[in-house]
């Protein structure tokens, strides 16, 4: 009996040792299995710090090693090529541009020679191979990289710290209690008063690149502007994040965002932008994604209605020869209505909800696109159209890796005002409640399925609005879905710039209201903004005003006092017109 117990204990020790060794090897990819066979390799100490260092070093090395070698072509020359009918900045509401957005048109307008395409495809493939090789971190490893659970992330630094200050106050005003991380770029470190004294009171903290990423990899990348966003998402401590641009204001409580069906189904929520998608066929070739030229699957964002409802070449296919149908799909159907492509509209990255564990590789590939964005991928994905930058790299990465995502189907709304009769000043994109949108989308799917015969008939009067957005994607009573975000990116809430650019002042010097849709988001948003700026920077004793680096050389100057007078005057005007703006009776 004693001998049997000893044998059992010895066996348990051996099994435990083997499990421990295998665990070490899974965490440290650089430890070869040959260690098990007698080679003397020193096993690194298992710490989160070592794991992070290994991760960032390997990631940056893979990005640097797979740099595209060719020079990016001149877009103006590409767009001037024979047969290119490129329509710059086709808006979501524009019609009559199907041929301009077709496979043939976008192919001719971004016609890379085969050698360059193959070169780009090779380095892209090598990088994605690294994602399934050296960077193939297990779920426990990914979770170990990010110590936090759930929270909100924004990018600060410079004037963006000032914008984040007001944005965070609005978050708390809605009742959102999720923790917040403000990512401070390397060149903007030193926001001590904001980061150490004010932010913790609002359950927030600053995250510095230099505290997370080893200095060598960080200097190798030389990140600027748009590239900082995706890297900021990666270095955030949260496993699941709501990302908000610093000028993007939530008008609904976000605490339950991670408990929604849409998020649990996909792990990545995106919102539509103002512009149609113009990514060329060359991009799909580079990422190794095939396009079925003969298969249309949507009409912009309507992928619920049968194609026969809006395309006579499908509903009456027998009336056309195979050659006529092929020409139709190649020359007259928007490329991004075809199977295998990213859906229209283009994406707007001022707000995103991301499961970083599930979409770990999506973020890493998006970083690759952003590092080489200025030289290649920004111009390739957006072809120089308005809003070019990081915004479409997230959906592009998810698409390239065949990862699930949900882009809100409901089109944004605009808020703004007419400065003069024909001079409309758009101030903000109003983005909708993503879970309401997803549930309505599922409901619409069931409605179409239950009435498939009727929906399959060709409707010569079909439009995206009357056939989908204003019929299938609205509440039962016909009302619009809720607004969730006010992305006020045009006149940013930077009091210094607003004053110097004379914003919210009419052509004759009169005060004007800019935000005209308080009924859509249930509050006087403009009054909230100006009230907060006035109290925070003017009526508060100067000794207690947060010492933002951005304001260092501006406080205690005559212009600062003039700025405060500007804010006070506009607050007084907004208060005097508040009831009228909210539709209240005196």
Curated annotation (Swiss-Prot):
Disulfide links within the chain: none
EC code: 2.4.1.-
Highest rank taxon of the organism: Eukaryota
GO biological process: mannan biosynthetic process; protein mannosylation
SUPFAM superfamilies xrefs: Nucleotide-diphospho-sugar transferases
Function: Responsible for addition of first and second mannose residues to the outer chain of core N-linked polysaccharides and to O-linked mannotriose. Implicated in late Golgi modifications.
Annotated protein name in UniProt: Alpha-1,2-mannosyltransferase MNN5
Source organism per UniProt: Saccharomyces cerevisiae (strain YJM789) (Baker's yeast)
Gene name of this polypeptide: MNN5
């Amino acid at each position: 009996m004693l001998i049997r117990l000893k044998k059992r204990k010895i066996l348990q020790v051996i099994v435990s040792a083997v499990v421990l060794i295998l665990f070490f090897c899974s965490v440290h990819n650089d430890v070869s299995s040959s260690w098990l066979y007698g080679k003397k390799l020193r096993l690194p100490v298992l710490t989160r710090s070592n794991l992070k260092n290994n991760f960032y070093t390997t990631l940056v090395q893979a990005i640097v090693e797979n740099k595209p070698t060719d020079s990016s072509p001149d877009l103006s020359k590409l767009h001037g090529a024979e047969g290119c009918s490129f329509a710059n900045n086709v808006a979501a509401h524009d019609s009559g541009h199907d041929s301009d957005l077709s496979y043939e048109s976008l192919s001719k307008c971004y016609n890379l020679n085969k050698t360059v395409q193959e070169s780009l495809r090779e380095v892209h493939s090598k990088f994605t191979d690294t994602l399934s090789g050296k960077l193939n971190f297990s779920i426990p490893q990914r979770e170990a990289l990010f110590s936090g659970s759930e929270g909100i992330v924004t990018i600060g630094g410079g004037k963006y710290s000032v914008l984040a200050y007001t944005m965070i106050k609005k978050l708390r005003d809605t009742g959102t209690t999720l923790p917040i991380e403000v990512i401070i770029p390397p060149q903007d470190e030193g926001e001590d008063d904001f980061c150490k004294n004010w932010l913790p009171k609002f359950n927030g903290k600053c995250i510095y690149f230099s505290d997370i990423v080893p200095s060598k990899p960080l200097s190798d990348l030389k990140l600027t502007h748009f590239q900082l966003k995706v890297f900021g998402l990666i270095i955030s401590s949260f496993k699941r994040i709501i990302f908000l641009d610093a000028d993007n204001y939530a008008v609904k409580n976000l605490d339950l965002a991670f408990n929604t069906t849409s998020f649990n189904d996909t792990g990545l929520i995106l919102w539509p932008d103002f512009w149609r998608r113009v990514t060329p066929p060359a991009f799909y070739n580079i990422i190794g994604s095939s396009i079925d030229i003969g298969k249309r699957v949507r009409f912009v964002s309507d992928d619920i209605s049968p194609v026969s409802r809006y395309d006579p070449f499908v509903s009456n296919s027998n009336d056309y020869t195979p050659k006529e149908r092929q020409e139709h799909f190649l020359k007259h159907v928007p490329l991004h209505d075809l199977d295998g492509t990213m859906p229209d509209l283009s994406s707007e990255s001022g707000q995103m909800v991301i499961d970083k564990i599930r979409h770990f590789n999506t973020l890493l590939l998006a970083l690759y696109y952003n590092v080489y964005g200025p030289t290649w991928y920004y111009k390739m994905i957006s072809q120089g159209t308005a809003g070019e930058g990081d915004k479409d790299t997230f959906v592009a990465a998810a698409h390239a890796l065949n990862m699930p995502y949900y882009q809100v189907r409901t089109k944004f709304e605009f808020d703004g005002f007419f400065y003069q009769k024909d001079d409309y000043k758009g101030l903000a994109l109003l983005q909708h409640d993503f879970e309401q949108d997803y549930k309505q989308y599922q409901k619409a799917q069931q409605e179409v399925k239950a009435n498939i015969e009727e929906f399959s008939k060709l409707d010569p009067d079909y439009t995206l609005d009357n056939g989908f957005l204003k019929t299938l994607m609205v509440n039962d009573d016909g009302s619009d879905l809720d607004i969730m975000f006010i992305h006020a990116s045009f006149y940013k809430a930077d009091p210094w710039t607003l004053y110097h650019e004379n914003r919210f002042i009419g052509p004759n010097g009169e005060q004007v209201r800019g935000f005209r849709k308080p009924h859509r988001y249930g509050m006087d948003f403009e009054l909230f903004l100006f009230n907060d700026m006035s109290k925070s920077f003017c009526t508060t004793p100067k000794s207690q005003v947060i010492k933002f680096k951005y304001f260092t050389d501006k406080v205690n100057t005559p212009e600062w006092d003039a700025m405060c007078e500007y804010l006070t005057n506009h607050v007084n005007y907004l208060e005097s017109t508040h009831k009228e703006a909210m539709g209240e009776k005196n």
